[in-house]
């Protein structure tokens, strides 16, 4: 084979070298293509809101659409959604049929049970050891030592609920939040 360059110190690319490079490139492309789904599996899906929050999800894992949600939930209703860090979080419907500006983390501060909302008694009652919380999640009867944690709940532009961390003063106790 003749060289295309005028310099004798530039080796030419032989047919064998070209086929070897082609084979290595094909093998590398196939390997990378096979690794793509494996790598994608380990990266969590982005479900965040604009401000670093988490979009609330229902029991089936679907995003909660506020307009649909308010058609099936009335004022004073509290229902569970998947919130920050995957914790069950109550979405609160206000008296004027809007979503409250806060959500209530449903994890009991005593031993970590999920605390259900008792509509008949208008309070949260822990089934594990009897702790009770008022409608805002403030502890009213032990053995739980602290009130339920709060999160900010905001309706996004695309009509979904975004939960973000609550770092301000706890409006129920006028103290710094213990969970922040």
Swiss-Prot record:
InterPro entries: Cyt_b6_f_Rieske, Rieske_2Fe-2S, Rieske_2Fe-2S_sf, Rieske_Fe-S_prot, Rieske_Fe-S_prot_C. One of its GO terms (cellular component) is plasma membrane-derived thylakoid membrane. Its EC number is 7.1.1.6. Signal peptide: none annotated. Gene3D superfamilies: Rieske [2Fe-2S] iron-sulphur domain, Single helix bin. Disulfide bonds join 113-128. Keywords: 2Fe-2S, Disulfide bond, Electron transport, Iron, Iron-sulfur, Membrane, Metal-binding, Thylakoid, Translocase, Transmembrane, Transmembrane helix, Transport. Its cofactor is [2Fe-2S] cluster. Residues 70-162 form the Rieske domain. CDD domains: Rieske_cytochrome_b6f (cd03471). [2Fe-2S] cluster binds at residues 108, 110, 126, 129. GO terms for biological process: photosynthesis. Binds 1 [2Fe-2S] cluster per subunit. The Rieske iron-sulfur protein is a high potential 2Fe-2S protein. The 4 large subunits of the cytochrome b6-f complex are cytochrome b6, subunit IV (17 kDa polypeptide, PetD), cytochrome f and the Rieske protein, while the 4 small subunits are PetG, PetL, PetM and PetN. The complex functions as a dimer. This is Cytochrome b6-f complex iron-sulfur subunit. It comes from Picosynechococcus sp. (strain ATCC 27264 / PCC 7002 / PR-6) (Agmenellum quadruplicatum). The gene is petC.
């Amino acid at each position: 084979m003749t060289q295309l360059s005028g310099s004798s110190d530039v080796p030419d690319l032989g047919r064998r070298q070209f086929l070897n490079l082609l084979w290595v490139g094909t093998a590398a492309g196939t390997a990378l293509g096979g690794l793509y789904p494996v790598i994608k599996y380990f990266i969590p899906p982005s479900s965040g809101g604009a401000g670093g929050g988490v979009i609330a999800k229902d029991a089936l894992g679907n995003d909660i659409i506020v307009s649909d949600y308010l058609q099936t939930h009335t004022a004073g209703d509290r229902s569970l959604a998947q919130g920050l860090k995957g914790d069950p979080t109550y979405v609160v419907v206000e008296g004027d049929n809007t979503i409250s500006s806060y959500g209530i983390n449903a994890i009991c501060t005593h031993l970590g049970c999920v605390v259900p909302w008792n509509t008949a008694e208008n309070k949260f009652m822990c089934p594990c050891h009897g702790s009770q919380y008022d409608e805002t999640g403030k502890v009213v009867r032990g053995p739980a030592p602290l009130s339920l944690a709060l999160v900010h709940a905001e309706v996004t532009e695309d009509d979904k609920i975004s939960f973000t961390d609550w770092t301000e003063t706890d409006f129920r106790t006028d103290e710094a939040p213990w969970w922040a």
